[in-house]
């Protein structure tokens, strides 16, 4: 979910998802091998092998006309003042994005671990989701963009949380365009959640806004989710803005790869659990992260 820029030759660096270019004191292949081994070893133990098997298959498709662009990001987040979950957590995250001849797909996986020694619940959990989208413009080979409207897509949100059934949300996505944004998407989902019923609806917004000043290159990226709270459920608001700073460029390396920054995450009725004086589910958490983007 980042900016597009100079790519490395595919023979020297695997072409994956979300990024710009690459320059580091060690080779991309070595970094990828170490990161992939570390993540796969742990996530496979947690029933996430399907995600891990998916990415190499996508990578092999790079040589065909089906793939326009793809990249992968790895990151490490420390989060504080959570509610429901452990108050302090550390979480390795793997994200991927691909642009294809018929649409695009976003993949996200997180392995969350407690840093709170007195937490009595599950100290480790995982969550992953796949969001494939089919583009009306690409399928019909007809550009429907007009003014701020860029495209209309059919979207699907397939997600899994540890010890829970799958969520499946089909929806309609509207992509927007403007000179000052990298991307802006609005998606309306019908929720068929882990309880196995079509009992809610969701509005999802995600965005990327780059800017720079005398301190360097920045971007604001994030998501906003609002569930309507149908059929007696509490409405939920989940806002997660992040401020990214291009640390790699500051250190003299090629821009667009090594990032650091802060994240805020105010939530109302977290996990659709009604906030009460006896059990608080409204939160305002914050955190820091380091992130590496590569092809």
Model-flagged regions — what are they?
Residues 62-113:
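Short glycine/proline- and aromatic-enriched beta-strand/turn motifs that initiate or cap beta-hairpins
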